[in-house]
């Protein structure tokens, strides 16, 4: 059997994640300031749902009456946490590997626009590079997702949609878990005109359940494997207009975090390399919450799901409560 390195979960309940704060132009805004945050950290799994735009539905979001000012051409940081009260050492379960992405949509009123429908364009993506996933980079960075705001887009109000996709159960259709929230921002210092990227996209509509970046067995991948990031190509400013030429393809990925970009280094617990399946053991009557891991190769946490959920096998490496 192929030797596998299995990341140990710190807690069965620490699986999910929320975009809770935005840092812009040196200011870290309070939790939920200018962001439509939910009280529950569950995923969206139906890529045809309107909830794919800015979350909601199974994870009801709370409106915010704040808009955050962001300079065109600057780098902002979407700050991710397991819950609204978690710290930098509790971002997302390390087993939840996948890409990170960010999109912008120009709107008339960032406070009231639902985000549903057209007008979206991708401005950030980090997929898989030499064995490193975008989500792992965010965890290593203490929850920071670095997002460059294009310098060439018009000033005005936008929705900034930050997203992390977990692929641990994505070997079957609708197994990918998508996490996203929308920040309400006002971009200043942009171009004086009204031109936007020539092509924009609709959410829902940017993904299909059968996209190779959403229907994939990550456990069969090697460090040299190629991964196709979901969604359209990333927008970049034309040469001589605040950025590099053209729009990048989505089959290449951003480099993993380096010591110069890490805000905080968080060491992930790693189990000993295993060459055989270890049967999970009961853990004193504990129960796992909805969407939490409850089984899989090398797993030794809670194997009983809280009522009314049951433990369902997604693949040999991951079972979850649903």
From Swiss-Prot:
Domain of life from the UniProt record: Eukaryota
Uses: Lignocellulose is the most abundant polymeric composite on Earth and is a recalcitrant but promising renewable substrate for industrial biotechnology applications. Together with cellobiose dehydrogenases (CDHs) an enzymatic system capable of oxidative cellulose cleavage is formed, which increases the efficiency of cellulases and put LPMOs at focus of biofuel research.
Protein purpose: Lytic polysaccharide monooxygenase (LPMO) that depolymerizes crystalline and amorphous polysaccharides via the oxidation of scissile alpha- or beta-(1-4)-glycosidic bonds, yielding C4 oxidation products. Catalysis by LPMOs requires the reduction of the active-site copper from Cu(II) to Cu(I) by a reducing agent and H(2)O(2) or O(2) as a cosubstrate. Active on tamarind xyloglucan and konjac glucomannan.
Localization in the cell: Secreted
Residues annotated for O2 binding in this entry: 168, 177
Binding residues for Cu(2+): 16, 96
CC per GO annotation: extracellular region
Stated name of the protein: AA9 family lytic polysaccharide monooxygenase A
InterPro entries noted in UniProt: AA9 (IPR049892), AA9_LPMO (IPR005103), CBD_sf (IPR035971), Cellulose-bd_dom_fun (IPR000254)
Keywords: Carbohydrate metabolism, Cellulose degradation, Copper, Disulfide bond, Glycoprotein, Metal-binding, Monooxygenase, Oxidoreductase, Polysaccharide degradation, Secreted, Signal
Phylogenetic placement of the source organism: Eukaryota, Fungi, Dikarya, Ascomycota, Pezizomycotina
One MF term in the entry's GO annotations: monooxygenase activity
